[in-house]
Each structure stands twice: as C-alpha cells, then as structure tokens.
Regions:
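C-terminal helical cap and adjacent loop that interface with cofactors, partners, or active-site loops
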Residues: 91-161
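Contiguous beta-strand/loop segments that form the cofactor/metal-binding neighborhood of enzyme cores
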Residues: 1-79, 108-122, 139-142, 159-161
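Short acidic, glycine-rich loop/turn motifs
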Residues: 38-42, 87-94
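Short polybasic amphipathic segments
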Residues: 62, 78-92
C-alpha cells in the first residue's frame, strides 16, 4: 500500500488532481504489477505502473511528455542518501538539462521541513492532510477498479484499501 501511495502522490503533484482510474493487477513470478490508466481534472491522461518486487536497483519517479518538451525524474531509496535525477528536454532549443541537486536528498529535506513546521511554525511546503486524503482516495479507487475491472471515479469511492 505504501508504494501505491507514493505513485499516486507523484502523479497528483505533477499533473494535478486525479479524477478517475482504470486499473488491473497482475501477479506472476513472485511479483505484483499494477497498471493504471489515469484521468486528470485538467483533461490530461496518464499511466501509473508499479511492480513489487523488482529485480533491479529500485527507484521511483515519473515521466512527462509534452508538446514543448519532456521531463524524466528518478528518486532512489532514501537510505542511499542519493539525490534524485531529473532530466529536462526542451523542444524550443533542442537542449537537454540535468538538474544537479547537491543538497537534494529528498527524505532528509522532507523530514527537516516537517520538523521546521512543527518546531518553528514555518509554512508547510510539502504534502498536507488534503494531499494525504487524495492519495488514499486514489488507492481505494485503484483497488475498486482492480476488483470490478472497470473505470472508477475518485469522487465515488468509500471504504478501506
């Protein structure tokens, strides 16, 4: 469930609110694989996939393909203390850029921001309770879609994952 939460949260942060999903689950060779077609409030379409357990150096991330360029991002296990890799491709000038994150260890930065919000009252710039609820609603919709084999609107879901 935690991995699904991360996948849903990534998509919501990158493309906006998810309104509906159509999902399937495949269980083979000791792996569980979710494949999810996603509809966003903006009208954009997306695809989520999650495989557990993978036979490789695990990472999570996202890929966005647009009219004027693309972004590919990878985030690694937090215990590696490794910055995320973000590549930006710009159609306008045919360039490729890799963002260097000298201080980009995401997990440490999230913990520091959380502690700062609690200890000093700093504004929360990370996910909040509404983001968490939207992520859980997305996971419930994915579970219901796997069960029914059909499209599920997030606004219509209730119950546990």
């Amino acid at each position: 469930v935690g991995d699904r939460a991360a996948v849903v949260a990534h998509e919501a942060a990158n493309a906006g609110d998810i309104t509906a999903v159509t999902a399937r689950l495949s269980e083979r060779g000791g792996m569980r694989c979710w494949f999810v077609d996603v509809e966003f409030a903006s009208g954009a379409l997306g695809h989520l996939d999650l495989a557990v357990a993978v036979r490789m150096d695990w990472h999570e991330g996202f890929e966005v393909y647009g009219e004027k360029g693309s972004i590919v991002a990878k985030t690694f296990n937090p215990w590696y203390y490794k910055s995320s890799e973000v590549d930006i491709f710009r159609e306008a000038d045919g360039s490729t850029h890799r963002v260097l994150g000298a201080d980009g260890h995401f997990y440490r930065r999230q913990l520091e921001a959380f502690a700062d919000a609690i200890l000093t009252g700093a504004p929360n710039e990370a996910a909040d309770i509404e983001d968490g609820l939207a992520s859980v609603r997305g996971m419930v919709a994915i579970a219901r879609s796997v069960e029914t084999g059909g499209r599920v609107a997030l606004a219509d879901v209730t119950g546990a994952v």
